Swiss-Prot record:
EC number: 2.8.1.-
Annotated source species: Ruegeria sp. (strain TM1040) (Silicibacter sp.)
Lineage: Bacteria, Pseudomonadati, Pseudomonadota, Alphaproteobacteria, Rhodobacterales
Name listed for the protein in its UniProt record: tRNA-cytidine(32) 2-sulfurtransferase
Pathway in which the depicted protein is active: tRNA modification
Reaction(s) the record says it catalyses: cytidine(32) in tRNA + S-sulfanyl-L-cysteinyl-[cysteine desulfurase] + AH2 + ATP = 2-thiocytidine(32) in tRNA + L-cysteinyl-[cysteine desulfurase] + A + AMP + diphosphate + H(+)
Length: 295
């Protein structure tokens, strides 16, 4: 089904490049996304036959555009039985082009909701000078997205984090948090009433960037994050870039390791019962000729 002509698809793909290179890129992204959706059980099968509804978060960055496009292609081809609602949270950052996303979504015939919440002022007021904005900004954004999802009757909030985000988070937790953890592809929020999905979990950042650029999507940079130097994530990204440059394919090897954990070969007694290890009850005795007792 993925070999259909590009013109016979959702408007998000209309005008896509007809090059062999782009077609291979598109098919790879679609394949990896479908793989993650199926592997992590993201689609609910409801007894009443109704379709689950997903809130697809759209920031205006390359990753969220790629996410929206690939989910709509899967749905268009009958491979994703869900209803999709795109959502942009305008957080009141100075210079944010408020009309870009609504106009784009209208043109692409995508159902959407645009929400304005001035979290920018809260972040600037609460975060001390010299500290990073990302943690508080993300927490405020996530809270608003959960609220919107509930108001719209959605069962899941869908985010555009990709393979490289997941790797970077793993190493940030390793280097700065002293734990082995990262962004999971699927989780339930603390309240227990919403799923959080990351369908691009297997997709490389470079592929998202190539795709969004080739499609000429109107990219909106995050000037708030980009205005800060020395961010931990940026430092980790530079380390991973160096490793990848020295050993091409290193990122994918490390990512596969996250899918191949061996608790018995780590050191966390909460994950593996080391105290319960026991030797097999093997009888090592052998029959020997009885030696007469000396008198």
């Amino acid at each position: 089904m993925l070999d259909q002509d590009l013109d016979d698809i959702h408007p998000l793909f209309q005008g896509a490049p007809q090059t062999t290179e782009f077609k291979k890129l598109r098919k790879r992204i679609v394949r990896y996304t479908r793989e993650a959706v199926e592997q992590y059980g993201m689609v609910e099968r409801r007894e009443d036959g109704s379709l689950p509804k997903w809130l697809v978060c759209l920031s205006g960055g390359k990753d969220s555009y790629t996410l929206l496009a690939v989910l709509y292609e899967l749905k268009w081809r009958g491979l994703l039985p869900v209803d999709l609602l795109a959502c942009n949270l305008d957080q009141g950052q100075p210079g944010f082009p408020a009309t870009v996303l609504p106009e784009f979504l209208e043109k692409m015939q995508v159902p959407h909701r645009i929400e304005y919440q001035d979290t920018y002022s809260i972040v600037m007021d609460k975060v001390p000078q010299g500290r990073t904005y990302c943690a508080l900004c993300s927490r405020l954004r996530r809270g608003n997205l959960y609220r919107i999802a509930r108001e719209e009757g959605c069962s899941a909030v869908v985010l555009g984090h990709h393979r490289d985000d997941i790797l970077e988070t793993f190493f940030m937790n390793l280097f700065h948090g002293g734990r082995l953890a990262t962004m999971p592809p699927k989780l339930v929020n603390e309240e227990g009433d919403l799923f959080v999905f990351r369908p691009l979990a297997h997709v490389a950042e470079a592929d998202c960037e190539k795709f969004a650029r080739a499609m000429n999507y109107p990219i909106i940079p995050c000037d708030l994050c980009g205005s800060q130097d020395g961010l931990q994530r940026q430092q980790v990204k530079q380390i991973l870039d160096t490793w990848e440059s020295n050993s091409p394919g290193r990122r994918q090897v490390m990512f596969r390791a996250l899918m191949n954990a061996r608790p018995s070969h780590l050191l966390d007694p909460k994950l593996f019962d080391f105290t319960g290890l026991a030797l097999k009850n093997i009888d090592n005795s052998t029959e020997t000729e009885e030696i007469p007792e000396l008198r």
